[in-house]
């Protein structure tokens, strides 16, 4: 029995029968469109003309020859023909073209489908197949791959994540078990880092919110242990409705809304961690009624007290501002239902149902809740948690009930803590979940608060600060009412900023005060600080200027009021710009933060290093702090203003890109970058008490400040900062090719660059009907074989053609000509898109795609020389030399094959 083969023979057999008219009633219907007519079965009892089914009988015999004999019992005469063509997609029936002749015979019209042929060198080359050429366009248009070494553990973790994306969520781990530290695809998982490190400092870092990773369920929420910290979704994205409704177990249902069971962040859920909003939170009231969250000792608040989540992001605020007040103290234009609800038509959560007795109508609407409670909290991002006003910890109450904190070994204001030992009830992770705590009496005297505790005391601790933001009221989504009270930021042009700043261990932050800025008399009465905070230094503490930041109708205004003038009226400088618009949401939250910069000594002429910036050395006499003010908006950075040794109080124009020119060399990073740097320090740096011992045990080369430089083996996946050429446009254009053999022009080819279209192959002779060369991705320049009289030269030329294989791949777009040396023959090309390499012959790289011609440079050159006629080509298009390096760009008689490629429009203008 012959071996079963493919179905290519069927197309060839049909085309041969049609071209030679081998069977009656079997002919072309439209040859150009590959349409042919075959006789249809006649009804029973009708007269069958002679030879009506001859084509089907011959086809059955050919099938028996190729595939072997087959039984014909129960098979119609035309059944095998139709099954083979339909099953192999060699042809399709065109029922819309069925017709009958004058003798009553009915005909079925088929249309051949163009397919590749095995005997085509271009379709199935020995060394180059269609798959390789199809990958070429992806390699050409994609940026270079990262060469960063990947650790084996990272590769294993990635395989786990890929396997877990399609797997169901594993069973919940017991609370006593501790998960293995892992890193997300984009940023460090802070909770995992704090699990292993002694100094547990919780900082919020965005994580990869794409497909579900290992250990995630269908909602995308990873089941984590108590060691893992919470994460926050992108502000402004609406939480998707959850499928969890009516839970019977309060710990298995994520609660967090009035009338639902409380969350259990110890080992089950991660609040507000993914696009689904508050992860694991039931979107409908549960059957358990209003349950208060558990205390750390296991007790609960009275069930009559509604549980208001203290961890909703800014983008979920009902309206603009912190708490715009109505007559009853509730937010304006918000009808207070009994439970929180999600409005599918509005991209925000509406948290209502707050009793008016728990609100403070007398408080200014724009002041942050934590500012009303006492001071400021260290690190936040745009998705920072906010505590409702009614449930704010008051003076002396433990702040860790609302925000995570880290212990520094000192006696905290909210409980005792010793070095190396976590407080009771927090195990050893030192990451405190969001749980309300009963009020406790304030500690007698002054006690240094922990990094994230609130402190009603005015004196800040003398410890190394961490970058802290200066808050600004967020801008809402759709409605942007005018902020009633501006935010005054003390600003100094001489000694230091004013003491109106409230300090914490996490850094210095502005505690806004309503109304007009303080007068110089008020500023004089404020005592100078002896802290190591870089914002305040010894000496003159007189504020010489104030910066007022307001938002009105979607515009950001920065007003500088200079108090140093001689006149009674202070000078005012106002800079205003509309806030940018991003996506379907009209506005997103805007955060103004002050990135701490080290002191700058005028006598030292060097820019501070990154470690120096992190060290935040307190400026002394003769030194001035540099605190640039930056607005982080929708992932972009805008310079709002700042001063340095050479700058005045007038801020630069808003909307300028953050470059070294407008910030005078100051390295300002985004929230993610800044927090990532802090994380790198925390990961590499042990606790303060054991750092010296660690340094003695590991004598290595240190930085000037005694801190190891963090080294990351596998960083986040980011696009390359600089491309070696401009990426091509998606629009394909026609191109013209001139072919030279040993320096003599032998022919000109013109090809139309239709995107995504393949061309009919003309090999071996003439047009092969029904053949589609699928290797034509991208444009494949098939150079015809040419001959020369010299046998020696002809032998070299044949080797070049064999090395070229089926063609030379090029990609022509509006931006230029791109190619890659996907051939076996050695090649050179002339010039480079970079003017630095102009008129230099460069060898092809077998792996890197290259730009042979830059349209922008050509147009710039022609515009610079308007008198030069277009017939003179000032910039040579893509010229490729195959087989030998030319003696010069003008003399290439020694090159066996030369190809000059022009973009069609440029060729038309030149000739």
UniProtKB/Swiss-Prot annotation:
Keywords: DNA-binding, Host nucleus, Host-virus interaction, Inhibition of host innate immune response by virus, Inhibition of host IRF7 by virus, Inhibition of host RLR pathway by virus, Transcription, Transcription regulation, Viral immunoevasion. The keyword DNA-binding applies. One of its GO terms (biological process) is symbiont-mediated suppression of host cytoplasmic pattern recognition receptor signaling pathway via inhibition of IRF7 activity. Residues 147-184, 211-302, 494-537, 681-727 are annotated as: Disordered. InterPro entries: Interferon_reg_fact_DNA-bd_dom (IPR001346), WH-like_DNA-bd_sf (IPR036388). Residues 222-231, 495-505 have a biased composition (Polar residues). Plays a role in host cell apoptosis modulation by promoting TP53/p53 ubiquitination and subsequent degradation and thus down-regulating TP53/p53-mediated apoptosis. Works as a potential viral transcription factor to modulate host gene expression to build favorable environments for the viral lytic life cycle and greatly accelerates the induction of an immediate early gene RTA, early genes ORF36 and ORF57, late genes ORF25 and ORF64, and latent genes LANA1 and v-IRF3. Inhibits host interferon-alpha production by interacting with host IRF7 and preventing IRF7 dimerization. This is Viral IRF4-like protein. It comes from Human herpesvirus 8 type P (isolate GK18). The gene is vIRF-4.
């Amino acid at each position: 029995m012959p071996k079963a083969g493919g179905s290519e023979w069927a197309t060839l057999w049909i085309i041969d029968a049609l071209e030679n008219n081998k069977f009656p009633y079997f002919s072309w219907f439209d040859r150009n469109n590959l349409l042919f007519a075959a006789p249809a079965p006649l009804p029973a009892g009708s007269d069958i003309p002679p030879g009506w089914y001859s084509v089907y009988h011959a086809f059955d015999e050919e099938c028996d020859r190729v595939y072997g004999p087959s039984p014909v019992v129960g098979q119609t005469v035309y059944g095998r023909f139709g099954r083979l063509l339909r099953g192999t997609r060699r042809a399709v029936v065109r029922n819309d073209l069925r017709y009958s002749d004058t003798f009553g015979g009915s005909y079925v019209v088929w249309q051949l489908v163009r397919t590749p042929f095995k005997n085509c060198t271009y379709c199935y080359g020995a060394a180059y197949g269609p798959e390789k050429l199809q990958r070429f366009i992806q390699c050409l248009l994609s940026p270079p791959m990262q060469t960063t070494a990947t650790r084996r553990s990272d590769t294993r973790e990635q395989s786990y994540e890929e396997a877990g994306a399609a797997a169901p969520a594993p069973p919940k781990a017991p609370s006593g078990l501790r998960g293995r530290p892992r890193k997300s695809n984009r940023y460090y998982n802070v909770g995992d880092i704090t699990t292993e490190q002694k100094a547990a400092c919780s900082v919020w870092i965005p994580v990869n919110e794409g497909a579900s990773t290992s250990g995630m369920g269908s909602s995308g929420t990873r089941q984590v242990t108590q060691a893992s910290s919470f994460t926050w979704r992108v502000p402004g994205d609406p939480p998707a409705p959850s499928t969890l409704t009516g839970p019977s177990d309060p710990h298995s249902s994520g609660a967090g809304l009035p009338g639902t069971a409380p969350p259990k962040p110890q080992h089950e859920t991660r609040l507000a961690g993914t696009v689904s909003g508050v992860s694991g939170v039931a979107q409908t009231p549960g059957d358990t009624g209003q349950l208060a969250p558990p205390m750390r000792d296991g007790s609960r608040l009275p069930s009559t007290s509604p549980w208001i989540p203290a961890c909703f992001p800014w983008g979920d605020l009902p309206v603009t501002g912190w708490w715009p007040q109505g007559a009853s103290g509730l937010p304006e234009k918000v009808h207070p239902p009994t439970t929180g609800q999600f409005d599918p038509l509005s991209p925000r959560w509406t948290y209502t149902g707050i009793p008016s007795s728990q609100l403070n109508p007398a408080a200014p609407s724009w002041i942050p809740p934590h500012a009303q409670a006492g001071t400021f909290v260290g690190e936040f991002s745009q998705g920072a948690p906010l505590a409702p006003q009614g449930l704010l910890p008051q003076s002396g109450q433990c702040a860790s009930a609302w925000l995570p904190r880290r212990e520094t070994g000192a006696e905290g204001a909210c409980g005792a803590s010793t070095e190396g030992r976590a407080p009771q009830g927090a195990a050893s992770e030192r990451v405190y979940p969001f749980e309300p705590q009963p009020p406790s009496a304030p500690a007698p005297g002054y006690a240094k608060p922990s990094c994230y505790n609130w402190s009603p005391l005015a004196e800040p601790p003398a410890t190394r600060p961490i970058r802290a933001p200066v808050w600004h009221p967020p801008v809402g989504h759709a409605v942007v009412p005018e902020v009633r009270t501006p935010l005054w930021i003390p600003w100094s042009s001489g000694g230091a900023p004013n003491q109106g700043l409230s300090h914490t261990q996490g850094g210095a932050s502005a505690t806004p005060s309503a109304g007009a800025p303080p007068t110089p008399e008020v500023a004089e009465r404020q005592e100078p600080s002896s802290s190591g905070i870089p914002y305040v230094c010894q000496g003159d503490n007189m504020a010489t200027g104030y910066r007022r930041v307001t938002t009105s109708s979607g515009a950001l205004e920065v007003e500088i009021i200079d108090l140093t003038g001689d006149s009674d009226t202070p000078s005012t400088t106002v800079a205003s710009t509309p806030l940018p618009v991003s996506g379907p949401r009209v506005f997103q939250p805007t955060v103004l933060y002050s990135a701490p910069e080290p002191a700058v000594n005028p006598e030292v002429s060097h820019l501070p290093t990154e470690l120096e910036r992190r060290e935040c050395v307190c400026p002394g006499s003769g030194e001035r702090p540099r605190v640039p003010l930056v607005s982080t908006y929708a992932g972009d950075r805008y310079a709002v203003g700042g001063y340095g040794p050479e700058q005045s109080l007038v801020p630069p124009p808003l909307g300028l890109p953050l470059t070294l020119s407008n910030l005078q060399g100051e390295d300002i990073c985004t929230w993610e970058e800044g927090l990532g740097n802090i994380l790198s320090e925390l990961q590499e740096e042990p606790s303060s008490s054991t750092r010296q011992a660690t340094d003695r045990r590991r004598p290595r080369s240190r930085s000037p400040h005694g801190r190891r430089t963090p080294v990351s083996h596998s960083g986040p996946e980011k696009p390359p900062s600089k491309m070696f050429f401009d990426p091509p446009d998606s629009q394909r254009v026609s191109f013209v090719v001139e072919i030279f053999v040993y320096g003599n022009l032998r022919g000109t080819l013109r090809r139309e660059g239709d995107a995504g279209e393949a061309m009919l192959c003309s090999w071996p002779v003439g047009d092969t009907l029904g053949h589609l060369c699928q290797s034509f991705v991208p444009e494949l320049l098939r150079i015809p074989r040419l001959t020369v009289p010299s046998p020696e030269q002809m032998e070299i030329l044949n080797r070049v053609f064999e090395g070229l294989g089926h063609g030379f791949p090029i990609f022509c777009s509006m931006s230029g000509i791109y190619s890659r040396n996907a051939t076996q023959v050695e090649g050179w090309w002339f010039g480079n898109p970079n003017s630095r390499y102009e008129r230099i012959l460069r060898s092809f790289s077998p792996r890197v795609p290259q730009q042979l011609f830059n349209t922008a440079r050509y147009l710039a050159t022609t515009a610079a020389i308007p008198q030069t006629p277009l017939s003179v080509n000032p910039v040579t298009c893509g010229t490729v030399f195959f087989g030998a390096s030319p003696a010069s760009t003008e003399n290439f008689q020694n090159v066996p094959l030369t190809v000059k490629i022009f973009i069609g429009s440029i060729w038309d203008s030149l000739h």
